[in-house]
């Protein structure tokens, strides 16, 4: 991380890698379990679409405001204890939204849910970057692949619970009760980084370094495309190509599965091509996918387009976090800056797609997604490793 740290009883790199990968999977599983029960919460509280949309803004607000605190917490308590506590809070928060008695309570609980998610997100990415740097080869794509796999596993459990008519309050409480100790045990193998006594604590709130904001702009393009595709692909298939509900749902499955598979395989590609060439190639694939979506007059073409979008953007955010680890004297602060920008993109994307669709068409909305994917091709150079940084990839990328 930085020169002003010492590691106490640091575990072997293999053990640390497995531990952080498990943490990513647990974090993703929380997301997957919750996402599948949103319709239950909507029906239970008799919310309109607008009220639900308002409530679902609060996790992103909570995450964006809390993320800058993660670095200070890690400095105060050490990386392993901070990750263990933040992940436990995030897992425990899973049980709370379904218990909300009304809209105001739901907004407040989702704010806390998002805040704990964001801080845990920064902590686990900071430690993932630390392990990657010490191993001297790319692992961040695989870690985010484990997050995607955890999301798919959590969503499968949630779908089974919903299909079986299980009350979401019971389902999410049981899921939280399982995930809290699982996450706690996983953190036992995480790196334990303690600041030296003379090391200055990072400020509670501070702007990240400019280089982190530039890296965040690349992440913004990728997460905008991801958020737009995840939230709107099924609607696009139904409204534009006339797909049935089942076929429309398949477009989401194609997108999510290709993203997960690409992330799990992405480290090998990064090691061979380097981060710049990998993101440029992915950006080109995403542009092709976006053009297929925009031009689609048949369901297979649109589904193929969304799948290519998933492949193209899959490794961008992991590589942005890896680059942020070198973007300033306090890696956790730079990572928090990148994470905040990407969370903002995830918040803006679904609404922006809806606004453009209302003013013009869904096809025009995904024209914007295609333009942002092209931005990955143009801006990938900001991810080039700094001079002297140890990488296991070609120096040109």
Predicted features along the sequence, with ranges:
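Helix-breaking motifs and short loop linkers at transmembrane-helix boundaries and internal kinks
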Residues: 46, 78, 99-104, 242, ...
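Intracellular juxtamembrane helix-capping segments at the cytosolic ends
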Residues: 118-134, 314-329
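Interfacial helix-cap and linker-helix signal at transmembrane-aqueous boundaries
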Residues: 41-42, 73-74, 160-165, 237-238, ...
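Helix-to-loop junctions at the C-terminal end of transmembrane segments
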Residues: 66-79, 162, 262-275, 357-358
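C-terminal transmembrane helical hairpin of 12-TM major facilitator-type secondary transporters
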Residues: 273-320
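Conserved MFS/SLC helix-loop-helix module at the cytosolic interface between two early adjacent transmembrane helices
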Residues: 65-104
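Helix-loop-helix hairpin linking two adjacent transmembrane segments in secondary transporters
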Residues: 143-194
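Short amphipathic helix-loop junctions that connect adjacent transmembrane helices
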Residues: 36-50, 231-247
């Amino acid at each position: 991380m930085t020169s002003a740290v010492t590691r106490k009883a640091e575990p072997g790199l293999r053990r640390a890698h497995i531990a952080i990968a498990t943490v990513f999977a647990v974090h993703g599983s929380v997301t997957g379990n919750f996402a599948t029960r949103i319709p239950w919460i909507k029906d239970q509280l008799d919310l309109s679409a607008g009220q639900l949309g308002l409530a679902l803004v609060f996790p992103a607000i909570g995450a964006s405001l809390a993320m800058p605190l993660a670095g200070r917490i890690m400095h105060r308590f050490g990386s392993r204890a901070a990750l263990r506590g933040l992940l436990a809070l995030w897992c425990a928060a899973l049980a709370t939204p379904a218990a909300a008695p009304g809209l105001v309570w739901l907004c407040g609980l989702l704010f806390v849910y998002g805040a704990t998610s964001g801080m845990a997100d920064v902590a686990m990415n900071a430690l993932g970057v630390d392990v990657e740097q010490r191993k001297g080869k790319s692992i961040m794509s695989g870690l985010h692949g484990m997050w995607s796999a955890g999301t798919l596993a959590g969503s499968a459990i949630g779908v089974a619970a919903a299909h079986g008519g299980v009350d979401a309050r019971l389902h999410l409480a049981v899921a939280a009760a399982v995930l809290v100790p699982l996450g706690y045990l996983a953190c036992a193998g995480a790196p334990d980084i303690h600041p030296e006594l003379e090391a200055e604590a990072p400020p509670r709130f501070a702007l990240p370094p400019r280089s982190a904001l530039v890296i965040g702009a690349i992440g913004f393009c990728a997460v905008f495309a991801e958020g737009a595709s995840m939230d709107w692909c099924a609607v696009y298939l139904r409204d534009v190509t006339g797909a049935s509900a089942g076929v429309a749902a398949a477009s989401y499955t194609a997108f999510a599965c290709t993203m997960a598979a690409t992330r799990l395989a992405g480290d090998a590609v990064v090691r061979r091509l380097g981060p710049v060439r990998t993101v440029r190639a992915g950006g080109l694939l995403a542009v092709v996918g976006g053009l297929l979506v925009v031009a689609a007059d048949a369901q297979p073409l649109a589904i193929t387009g969304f799948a290519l979008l998933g492949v193209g953007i899959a490794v961008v955010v992991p590589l942005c976090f890896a680059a942020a680890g070198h973007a300033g004297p306090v890696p956790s602060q730079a990572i928090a800056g990148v994470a905040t920008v990407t969370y903002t993109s995830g918040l803006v994307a679904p609404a922006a797609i809806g606004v453009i669709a209302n003013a013009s068409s869904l096809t025009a909305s995904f024209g914007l997604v295609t333009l942002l994917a092209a931005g990955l091709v143009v801006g990938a150079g900001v991810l080039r490793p700094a001079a002297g940084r140890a990488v296991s990839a070609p120096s040109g990328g």
